[in-house]
Curated annotation (Swiss-Prot):
Keywords: DNA damage, DNA excision, DNA repair, Endonuclease, Hydrolase, Nuclease. It comes from the Bacteria. Pfam families: UvdE. Its EC number is 3.-.-.-. GO terms for molecular function: endonuclease activity. NCBIfam families: uvde. One of its GO terms (biological process) is pyrimidine dimer repair. It is an enzyme of class 3 (hydrolase). InterPro entries: UvdE, UvdE_bac, Xyl_isomerase-like_sf. This is UV DNA damage endonuclease. Gene3D superfamilies: Divalent-metal-dependent TIM barrel enzymes (3.20.20.150). It comes from Bacillus cereus (strain ATCC 14579 / DSM 31 / CCUG 7414 / JCM 2152 / NBRC 15305 / NCIMB 9373 / NCTC 2599 / NRRL B-3711).
Length: 317
């Protein structure tokens, strides 16, 4: 069984390398037209150049998974801001794409919790489509839209989970097919359990990104041993390994909050269940210390008898 690892957005080991530098709409409004464009394009260029630095770092450390920052282009989906963030930066998008393709990196996006399809308010669905389209356009500009995924949560329950799930199935029809084809769903830590999310994924033929920490915070009746094969099966039509999110609680009191690093004892039960099924899969680490947490976890896991480190961020068990 091969397990590959990756992390989210910022490489903590790199100095001044945020790929998510921002520009607020408030500061944008205060500037003249030319100043707005100059400032905004400067921030975007920084984010893209920092992303390139991070990709070089990942390649050097043989880290095959990476989640791009959704904030890579500030104000991209703001209704009062219109600008060309694709054509102007074509050389940089292509440079990012060339690195990803040459080194066979697995890239993803994870829009925020407001991008959802369960609401009864039409503007929420419209905004979700706008946000999903923004993420897809970036993947397309990079040249990896047909092999990369945009991951979201199911959404809210709004007092009636059954009705909300029905709305999800209706609202998702409004998302263009080519974008839906590149989306995944994740179980959350309060509302939609692993079993509920799996059912939705199966009905819509959407790959399921299983989050173990969320599962432990929002348990369902069905045991994970029974659910995991079906979860992994949702990826079968993609020819890509299933992906799992890993983090651990900050404390018993703050169980849902993410700790700085991964507590190996917390994730061991999941790893043993996965080993029983012996299916290759990828792990996205969602700890606060990101790449540093990744290295620490791999060091700890590779010290276990029977687990062999075969590259910077890949284990064989």
């Amino acid at each position: 069984m091969l397990i590959r690892f990756g992390y989210v957005s910022h490489a903590m080991a790199l100095w001044d390398c945020s790929p998510a530098k921002t520009m607020t709409f408030t500061s944008f409004k205060k500037l003249s037209k030319q100043e707005r464009e100059d400032k905004l394009y400067h921030v975007i260029r920084q984010n893209l150049e920092h992303t390139i630095r991070i990709l070089h770092y990942n390649i050097a450390h043989e880290i095959p998974l990476y989640r791009l920052s959704s904030s890579i282009v500030p104000l991209a989906t703001h209704p009062e801001v219109e600008f060309d963030y694709i054509g102007v930066f074509t050389p940089l998008w292509r440079k990012i794409g060339a690195l990803i393709k040459e080194h066979n990196l697995r890239i993803s996006f994870h829009p925020n919790q407001f991008t959802l399809f369960t609401s009864d308010k039409p503007h929420i669905t419209t905004n979700a489509i706008t946000d999903m389209t923004y993420h897809y356009k970036i993947l397309d500009a990079i040249g990896i839209a047909d092999s990369s995924y945009i991951n979201i949560h199911v959404g809210g329950a709004y007092g009636n989970k059954e009705k909300a799930i029905e709305r999800f199935h209706e609202n998702i029809k409004k998302l263009p097919t080519h974008i839906k084809k590149q989306m995944t769903l994740e179980n959350d830590d309060k509302t939609y359990t692993t079993a509920e999310t799996l059912s939705i994924c199966q009905k819509e033929n959407i790959p399921f990104v299983f989050d173990y920490h969320h599962h432990m915070a929002n348990l369902c009746e069905e045991p994970l041993e029974e659910l995991l094969p079906a979860i992994f099966e949702t990826w079968s039509h993609t020819n890509i390994s299933p992906k799992v999110h890993i983090s651990s609680p900050r404390s018993e009191k703050e169980f849902r909050a993410h700790a700085e690093y991964i507590d190996l004892e917390f994730i061991k039960p999941f790893l043993h269940i996965a080993k029983k099924h012996n299916h290759n899969f990828d792990i996205m680490i969602e700890s606060k210390q990101k790449d540093l947490a990744l290295f620490q976890l791999i060091d700890e896991l590779s010290a276990i008898r029977g687990i062999k480190r075969i590259s910077g961020a890949m284990l064989q068990w």
